[in-house]
Amino acid sequence: LVNWSKPVVVLKEPFHLSYPWVFEENEKVYMIPETGQDGSIRLYEATSDSLSSFRLVKKLLEQPKDKEIKMGYGDSSIYKKDGKYYLMTMLQYSEPVNVLELYISDKFEGPYTPHPSSPIIESNKVGRDAGCWLEHQGKLLRVSQDCTHRYGDNVHVSEITKLSPTEYEETILKEKILPTDIPFYKEGGHQFNVINFKGKWIVATDAKEYHRLIGTRIIHKIKSKL
């Protein structure tokens, strides 16, 4: 983790890409980025050992065409337990409220069907994931981004207490884990990922930054032309 290679474009599509969740399954490396603008959840496979290029394998889910969609699939991840694959994702229907949905499949590549407990949550506070599910000290954790007042205000942690083909339950474990008293996190953040690497825990987060001066200059220019 000391030396880093030069950044390269590993995937290019004619729609918005973000939240590049990269993982390994059956000795192959895959990626599920956010592709909600396309109206689908897409699975890509790495085509090089350097992970510098990916190819589309298939669409795991496509948005329902009989419902009004305000915001497409966002921040999707898969978790495997007891031979079942659980896919968690977020949608916004006719109202600006995050709806957390859960799907299940016997196979990694699907088909995925709605879990009996889905939708899990309809909430702007904890209804959108902030990273993949985490296993820590015997607990299964889900991190969520708080969008109550604005996009990515902070991150909460919930413990998933029940997960089976027929049940899902969770409870909030800790709220606002990003320390906003530290200048770096002053404006909040919306992502939290953890990995155990060579016996040590490595945490990746982000932080929001507002360029108020730039916004002020733009407003000034607009007013000066009126």
PLM features per residue range, with description:
Residues 1-226:
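Carbohydrate-active catalytic/glycan-binding domains of CAZyme proteins
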